[in-house]
Amino acid sequence: MKLLLRGHDDRYAVEQLQLALFPEEPMEPVTEPFSGDGAVSSLHTGALWLTATAEITLHGKTGRACRRLRAAEADVPARRRLLQNTYYEAAMCLREPPAWGSLSGVRPTKLTTRALLEGKTPAEAEKLLRTRYHVSPERSRLCVEASEATVQAAQLLRPQDVSVYVGIPFCPTRCAYCSFVSSSIERFSGLLEPYLDALIREIAHTGDLLRASGRTVRTLYIGGGTPTTLSAAQLRRLMEALRTHIDLTELVEYTVEGGRPDTLDAEKLETIASMGCGRMSINPQTMNDTVLARVGRRHTAAQTAAAYEAARAAGYDAVNMDLIAGLPGDDPASFADSLRQVLALAPENVTVHTLALKKGADLYAGRMELPSADDVAQMLAGAEASLRAAGYTPYYLYRQKYMSGSFENIGWCRPGTAGLYNIYMMEEMHSIVSLGGGAMTKINLPDGRLERFHNPKFPQQYLERIDDVLAQKDAAFRLL
């Protein structure tokens, strides 16, 4: 779908909205007038008024809209909203309103969290989403509830606090829906020990920097990939290094992402718990064995239940379980049954993801038929009803590009069990110091900006460039 800008260069703001509203139409930026399908976003800047117009033609039908904004009120955010709202109104002549209205970003809760922190009531924050951004009442309510959990989690933070993420970029196999840069253990098992050697060097160096800077670690998250592809002995070595080199005495949450149930056994779960971890994530994605096989996950629903019971026996304070709505071969009835089985286990947290068709994933090639957007909407609505009935509330929420139906991912929790790292990371509430291959450190600057530092993506690159990684950590901590 062609996109022509006239009188402005806010391409990103308009492009992201076009991708969200017309995900099935390939994006084609142009600089010259055209005929046929496409969109034109125009802005005329006068002495007193800014006038935005949008005209969208698709399959022989055309939608048009025009809006104005006083020049005196036209700061950068207001101008972008003007362009997006004008484009949105033109698009609504051609399609049904989406659940998230004109919002195209991945963190819609930032708007409502800011509103609550500024003293607005939950009702006023909901109204902001509905009236300014055309968000549906249902999504507005979810957003505000997640923001209320964010405000509560913020009360645990102190100025010197940071969170630490440790990445293990290895998996047993690659799932069909995943684009994460991880290495299959079947092919790269020889890299595990050298990778741990390099990672422990980064851990030790980071511990020195944390002490020198006076920073304290509030939450610690070991993710991946699948960290539990490591053996029990390797997990003990990693976690002992963390305990030795980094002061963990002021942690309020320690999570390990077990992920694939087929990588979990009693020995690993007991080892992880004995090293101080209190929160375990076990992610079936579905409890339908046929769907599991279709997406390349080599485990069964029975293995998920067994891993959960082993985690309970090991004494974890909280267990999270993930499900994905929209997997190939799934349908609303099957998804509801997966959730029923998960709720019967009674985990403290349930995260309901919406399938995102990521460009690096096997599913992106389109070789498998996926549930319709209407089916995904039914899955999510049914999940919300079941989770609320079971006593869960939303505690964090985010969106991704190319999601089925342009919906969202939501973390649900029982009272008092919100996953704090997830909130702090997703809401960018404080600096996240990240270690390992593919990890990204985010430093929150005093002026509100974020400075990002990327580690090499692939394990072999990480090993070869570990000295550069340590030097980059020095640069990051100079900003803290």
Enumerate the predicted regions with their spans:
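Short beta-strand motif preference
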Residues: A52-A54, V166, M280-I282
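Canonical Radical SAM [4Fe-4S] cluster-binding loop centered on the CxxxCxxC motif
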Residues: D161-L196
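Radical SAM enzyme core and accessory elements
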Residues: M1-K120, L199, P415-L480
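Beta-strand scaffold of nucleotide-dependent catalytic cores
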Residues: G167, S281, N349-H353, I423, ...
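Short, glycine- and charge-enriched coil/turn segments that flank and shape catalytic ligand pockets
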Residues: K61-G63, R68-D75, G119-E124, L209-R215, ...
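Conserved non-cysteine loop/helix-boundary elements of the Radical SAM core domain that shape
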Residues: S182-A383
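N-terminal [4Fe-4S]-dependent radical SAM core
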Residues: A90-P97, L117-V164, S213
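A C-terminal junction/extension of Radical SAM enzymes
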Residues: P29-A39, G360-L435
